[in-house]
């Protein structure tokens, strides 16, 4: 069997060496090479002054898109905040009461305290309500574009109302 295969390959190589045109059965000339295609592509795009890839400026921002980005951002910020709070409680001298007394001794006005509490509670409430919205999506509900926008508005209203209420406590 090996001898037959060797004989066939040997004949093929001999034919290719003596007369290469007989060994190529369906010789089709290439239209263009990859290099020519690439040069034509770059010449066309550079001449038209368009960006290399879809750029952020061509997208129309929608409420669900912005809320998705904000949900990720609040998740990162809340994780970092909890981690920093835990590390500061572990490493700073004193206890909670001494830190609370320090804040009270600063004599900050009620407006500044309310604003600080609102700033702390707003990302938490947004992430919570938007997380509930994502859980509803996991059930397969509210996935049409109008429902996405409506649920986004509801999340924003609930976020503001609950943040105002919690900051007032």
Curated annotation (Swiss-Prot):
Its cofactor is heme b. Membrane-anchoring subunit of succinate dehydrogenase (SDH) that is involved in complex II of the mitochondrial electron transport chain and is responsible for transferring electrons from succinate to ubiquinone (coenzyme Q). SDH also oxidizes malate to the non-canonical enol form of oxaloacetate, enol-oxaloacetate. Enol-oxaloacetate, which is a potent inhibitor of the succinate dehydrogenase activity, is further isomerized into keto-oxaloacetate. This is Succinate dehydrogenase cytochrome b560 subunit, mitochondrial. GO terms for cellular component: mitochondrial inner membrane; respiratory chain complex II (succinate dehydrogenase). Pfam families: Sdh_cyt. It comes from the Eukaryota. Component of complex II composed of four subunits: the flavoprotein (FP) SDHA, iron-sulfur protein (IP) SDHB, and a cytochrome b560 composed of SDHC and SDHD. Residues 93-112, 167-169 are mitochondrial intermembrane. InterPro entries: SQR/QFR_C/D, Succ_DH_cyt_bsu_CS, Succ_DH_cytb556, SuccDH_FuR_B_TM-su. The chain crosses the membrane at residues 63-92, 113-137, 145-166. Keywords: Electron transport, Heme, Iron, Membrane, Metal-binding, Mitochondrion, Mitochondrion inner membrane, Transit peptide, Transmembrane, Transmembrane helix, Transport, Tricarboxylic acid cycle. The lineage of its organism: Eukaryota, Metazoa, Chordata, Craniata, Vertebrata. Its main location: mitochondrion. It is found in: Mitochondrion inner membrane. It is a multi-pass membrane protein. The heme b is bound between the two transmembrane subunits SDHC and SDHD. Detected in heart muscle (at protein level). Heme b binds at residue 127. One of its GO terms (biological process) is tricarboxylic acid cycle.
């Amino acid at each position: 069997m090996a001898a037959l295969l060797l004989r066939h390959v040997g004949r093929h190589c001999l034919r290719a060496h003596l007369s290469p045109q007989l060994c190529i059965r369906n010789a089709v000339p290439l239209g263009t090479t990859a290099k020519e295609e690439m040069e034509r592509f770059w010449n066309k795009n550079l001449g038209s002054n368009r960006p290399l890839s879809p750029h952020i400026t061509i997208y129309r921002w929608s409420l669900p898109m912005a809320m998705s980005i904000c949900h990720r951002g609040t998740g990162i910020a809340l994780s970092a905040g909890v981690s920093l709070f835990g590390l500061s409680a572990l490493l700073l001298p004193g206890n909670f009461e001494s830190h609370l007394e320090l804040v009270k001794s600063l004599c900050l006005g009620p407006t500044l305290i309310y604003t600080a509490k609102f700033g702390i509670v707003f990302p938490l409430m947004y992430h919570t309500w938007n997380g509930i919205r994502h859980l509803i999506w996991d059930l397969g509900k509210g996935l049409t574009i109008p429902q996405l926008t409506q649920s986004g508005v509801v999340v924003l209203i609930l976020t503001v109302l609950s943040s105002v209420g919690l900051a007032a406590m």
